[in-house]
């Protein structure tokens, strides 16, 4: 048929904090197989709250001819899977190729810089990567207030924080 009879599972995407994982490939196509977790991103507290950024997207999974065996590596510990590490940092889940219909990879959330999830099959799409963000933190006494664009401006103790999710500038 031209198709492999054993599962084809994608590796997870690497990101800021490390590489993605390797896919699980069992010796029999009826075993549980899944795409690998996305790479670990980085946690930052620049906004005053710990937030994960730049996580890798999970790899997609496709186990042909065995509809119940392929699963995306989306972090369901009840199913015996490891957590998709990249998801904690804005990475997205991978798709499942042998579901009906086959599923695309998930899009990563906006403004966290994470990777999109891998697709589960040739005829569906990978998820889109998340948009980035620029965050500036400075002592309020040094903040000039001169900006372009529409940054979110907040304070945390003695500091002012500017968060740009689109284009803009700050002049110090």
Predicted regions located by residue number:
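Low-complexity, glycine/proline-biased repetitive segments and flexible coils/loops
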Residues: 1-172
């Amino acid at each position: 048929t031209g198709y492999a009879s054993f599962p084809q599972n994608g590796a997870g995407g690497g990101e800021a904090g490390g590489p993605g994982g390797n896919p699980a490939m069992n010796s029999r196509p009826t075993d549980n197989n899944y795409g690998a977790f996305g790479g670990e991103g980085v946690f930052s507290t620049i906004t005053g709250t710990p937030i994960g950024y730049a996580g890798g997207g999970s790899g997609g999974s496709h186990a042909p001819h065995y509809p119940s065996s392929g699963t995306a590596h989306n972090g369901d510990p009840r199913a015996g899977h490891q957590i998709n590490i990249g998801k904690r940092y804005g990475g997205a889940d991978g798709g499942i190729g042998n579901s009906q219909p086959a599923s695309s990879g998930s899009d990563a959330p906006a403004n966290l810089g994470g990777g999109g999830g891998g697709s589960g099959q040739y005829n569906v799409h990978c998820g889109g990567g998340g948009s980035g963000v620029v965050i500036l933190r400075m002592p309020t006494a040094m903040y000039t207030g001169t900006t372009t664009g529409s940054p979110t401006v907040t304070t945390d103790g003695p500091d002012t924080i500017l968060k740009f999710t689109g284009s803009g500038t700050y002049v110090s």
